[in-house]
C-alpha cells in the first residue's frame, strides 16, 4: 500500500502543527508546534479550553491582588495565556513550541528583549527548559536586533512575518535559530496585484521565495533553520518537501494524510551549492534599501503586524469580559 503524503513528508522534513488547538496537536503528533496571536485568540474562544482561560485569569488576579483593576488583571492574564497554551502543548509534543512576543513591540528592540525574557521566565518557573521554547518575533530590523541579543543569552528565536531575502539574510548573519518565511501570504499579494486567479505550485511566488532562501542558506553554510509557513493549499507544501521544517494548519495536515501518491524531495542541501545566487551582506542600510524596493514585503510585513495587533486587542477584550463574568458569579 502506498504511503500518504504526510507520512512521506515526515521522512524529509520536520512537520510542525500551526495551531493553538491542543486536540488537533494530539491527533497529528507533530514534533513541534507554533502559535501566534490569531491562533491563541481562536483557541481561547473554544469551549474546551475555557478552563485554561479561567485558570490564567484567576492566577493573574491572585498575583496582583484584589486592589488591581480588571484591566490590569486582564493585561497580566493576556501576557500569560500564550504560555499557558504553550505549557499544555509541550505536554503532548517532544520538541519545541513557538510563543510570540506582543506584535505592538515589533519596532521596539528593548521592549521585545524584555518581553521575551519574561516569557522564558514563565516557562522556566513551570519547569520547562528554554531549549524547548522559540520566541516568535516579527522580522523587522528592530526585531532582528532584539533576537540577536536574545540568542547570545541562549534564548532561541523564530523570526516570523518574513517575506523577503533581505530579512532572511539579516537573520542568518545574526545567528538566529529559525525563520518562518511565509508562503500563502506572498501568493495572496501576487494574486491581488496581478489579478491572476491561480498559480501552479512550481510557479507559486511564495514557494519560489522559500526555495531561494533555503538554497541561499545551504549554499553559504548558514545554520539558521528554515520553516516554511502560511500555506493556502497542499501543492505549496509538496513543492517544499525537504525544507528543514514546515508548519502546517490542521486542515492541511488532514488533507495530506488523506492523499496518496509519490512525494519527490524538492529541496536538498546537496543541490544548493549549484544554486545561481551571489552572497550579499545585509546591514541596516542594505536592509532598509532592499525592503523599500520590495513592495510586497513592505506591505505584507505591515499588514501582518497590524493583523496580529488586532488579534491581541480582541483577546484583551475577551479576557476583560470573561474576568467580569467570573468575578460577578
UniProtKB/Swiss-Prot annotation:
<keyword id="KW-0808">Transferase</keyword>
<dbReference type="InterPro" id="IPR004730">
    <property type="entry name" value="Transaldolase_1"/>
</dbReference>
<dbReference type="InterPro" id="IPR018225">
    <property type="entry name" value="Transaldolase_AS"/>
</dbReference>
<dbReference type="GO" id="GO:0004801">
    <property type="term" value="F:transaldolase activity"/>
</dbReference>
<dbReference type="InterPro" id="IPR001585">
    <property type="entry name" value="TAL/FSA"/>
</dbReference>
<comment type="function">
    <text>Transaldolase is important for the balance of metabolites in the pentose-phosphate pathway.</text>
</comment>
<comment type="similarity">
    <text>Belongs to the transaldolase family. Type 1 subfamily.</text>
</comment>
<protein>
    <recommendedName>
        <fullName>Transaldolase</fullName>
        <ecNumber>2.2.1.2</ecNumber>
    </recommendedName>
</protein>
<feature type="active site" description="Schiff-base intermediate with substrate">
    <location>
        <position position="136"/>
    </location>
</feature>
<keyword id="KW-0704">Schiff base</keyword>
<dbReference type="GO" id="GO:0005737">
    <property type="term" value="C:cytoplasm"/>
</dbReference>
<keyword id="KW-0570">Pentose shunt</keyword>
<comment type="pathway">
    <text>Carbohydrate degradation; pentose phosphate pathway; D-glyceraldehyde 3-phosphate and beta-D-fructose 6-phosphate from D-ribose 5-phosphate and D-xylulose 5-phosphate (non-oxidative stage): step 2/3.</text>
</comment>
<dbReference type="GO" id="GO:0006098">
    <property type="term" value="P:pentose-phosphate shunt"/>
</dbReference>
<dbReference type="Pfam" id="PF00923">
    <property type="entry name" value="TAL_FSA"/>
</dbReference>
<dbReference type="GO" id="GO:0005975">
    <property type="term" value="P:carbohydrate metabolic process"/>
</dbReference>
<dbReference type="InterPro" id="IPR013785">
    <property type="entry name" value="Aldolase_TIM"/>
</dbReference>
<keyword id="KW-0963">Cytoplasm</keyword>
<comment type="subunit">
    <text>Homodimer.</text>
</comment>
